[in-house]
Amino acid sequence: MSIVKIKDKTFKTSIPEAEILKKVQVVADRINKDFEGKKPVFLAVLNGSFIFAADLMRMITIPSEISFVKYASYEGTSSTGSMKTLMGINQNLAGRHVIIVEDIVDSGFTMAHMIEELKKMNPASVEICSLLVKPGNLKVNLDINYAVMEIPNDFIVGYGLDYDCLLYTSPSPRDKRQS
């Protein structure tokens, strides 16, 4: 088991890279099938989703577009419950099929906020594609049709997920050790 220390926390490998990539391919195959002929727009939520979005987009075989948005709702390891838009949507999405690409759906507040904003733009559809989902921690009702995997309510770093803005780019996510 590989262990890494970031600031004051210690993390251990929780999901091997090969397992993630295999499951990302399964989700990409579903999206390719479900959106064939629809030219979806992928909206990747920065910073955490950038590695997942890159891997996913390499597996997408249908014509599509990608754009990026950035929100802030975390301080350290905790969600603040409030949402700050740091980089918003600057594209006409009317009549388009939109797929939000997120690193992790925890409380669901970021996704609920994004969906509310997107609906004002009259898209044909809005779907959520998340690398990780914490179903036991969801505070809002969301339809997450493209989840790579569900995890318990652990704090995870790696594969683009950060701890207090300190990025850990290990290809395998790690969860916080109890110490």
Where on the chain are the PLM-derived regions?
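Short glycine-rich phosphate-binding loop at a beta-alpha junction
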Residues: 38-46
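PRPP/pyrophosphate-binding module of the type I phosphoribosyltransferase fold
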Residues: 84-157, 161
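A generic "structured core" feature
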Residues: 30, 43, 51-88, 98-99, ...
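Active-site-facing substrate-recognition patch
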Residues: 1-39
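Residue-level signature of catalytic and energy-coupling elements of molecular machines
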Residues: 20, 42, 159
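Short secondary-structure boundary/capping segments
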Residues: 3-5, 12, 34, 58, ...
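Conserved small/polar residues in nucleotide/adenosyl-binding loops
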Residues: 168-175
